[in-house]
Each structure stands twice: as C-alpha cells, then as structure tokens.
C-alpha cells in the first residue's frame, strides 16, 4: 500500500482506494466472514450462511480475456489522480498486479489510515452488455452487528453519493443504484 499526498489545496482527508482482487493465491485462503464469527446474511461470491470466505477471490474475466484485477487497478489509478487533483490524499491499497493483503487486511489498513474506503469491482454475471453501476448497500441482517451498526448509514450515504455522481455524468445505473450484499469488508469497517 502507498499513500499519496495532494500537491495543493489539501483537504486533510484520506481516501482509501482499493483496486479489487489482485492477490496471488488469495482464492486458496479463507478468512472469517464477520468479526464475531456469525454466518453471512446474504449470498454473493460467498454463500449465505457461510462463516468463512475466500480471502481475495480471483474476480471475473471480461469477454476479451482481461482480468477484473487489471481493470480495477486502472480504474483506481484514474480515481487516485482525480482525487489528488481535488486536494484529497489517497491511500492506494494496491499499486501493482499483486498485493498480499486479503479483504480483512485491506479493510483494517483503511480503518487505520483513511477517512473512507472505496473498493472498486466489476460484476461478472456473464451479460454481454454493461448493466450499470451500483454500490453494495448494507443488508438489514448486518445493521445491528458492530462495527457495522456504528457506520452503516455513512457507508450507504457514501455509496449513494458516488452513484448519484456517476448518474450525473451520464453513466448507466443498475436498477436503483444499490444492491444489498453481506461483504466481509463491510463487516470489518470502522470508517
């Protein structure tokens, strides 16, 4: 991970940018889904009811053979440059093809260094078209579990704000712009 400081008009806000995936061997390692050991409340890349999840999955592959991790890193680098230009400092969780930080470690790193954590991903459901942007909202089953209970409203507000910005820029938005998924990263986040 690397922190970049804005050259001018610094806002004293650090944005954690996590280019999803990009860990050699991450799919063969498991981490607890929730800090309290409780089972997942929804499905996703890990089934509902599971107590352990893949540390970092390999992600999807685009129709042209490009790995999701390659595209998320390119997106993260563009986002980093735009944030720095606006005066935000940026914690880049991953700056290359491989970083040996699982989803829990990435979240804990952002918890300790950043003011917010944005994890970039693509949804690989085999569609031959762009179904649109969305953020992962916090499912009701997690809203009473700490540290989620103390932060879920901020998580959802940030996600909604990001999607609204994308909508304003003319991007395609998936359904209402959010999808309830029990993510390991959400359950460990304190920012």
Listing of model-derived features with the role each one plays in the protein:
Residues 1-191:
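Catalytic-site microenvironment of enzymes
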């Amino acid at each position: 991970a690397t922190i970049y400081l804005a050259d001018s008009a610094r806002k004293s806000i650090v944005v954690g940018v996590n280019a999803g995936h990009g860990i050699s061997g991450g799919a063969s390692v498991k981490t607890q889904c929730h800090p309290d050991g409780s089972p997942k409340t929804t499905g996703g890349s890990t089934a509902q009811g599971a107590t352990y999840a893949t540390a970092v999955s390999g992600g999807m592959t685009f129709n042209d053979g490009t790995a999701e991790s390659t595209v998320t890193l390119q997106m993260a680098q563009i986002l980093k440059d735009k944030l720095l230009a606006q005066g935000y400092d940026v914690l880049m969780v991953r700056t290359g093809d491989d970083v040996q930080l699982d989803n829990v470690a990435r979240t804990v790193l952002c918890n300790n260094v950043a003011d917010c954590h944005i994890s970039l991903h693509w949804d690989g459901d085999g569609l031959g078209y762009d179904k649109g942007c969305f953020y992962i909202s916090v499912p009701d089953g997690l809203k009473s579990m700490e540290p989620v209970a103390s932060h879920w409203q901020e998580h959802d507000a940030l996600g909604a704000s990001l999607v609204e910005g994308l909508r304003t820029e003319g991007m395609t938005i998936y359904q209402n712009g959010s999808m309830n998924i029990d993510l390991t990263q959400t359950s460990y986040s304190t920012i």
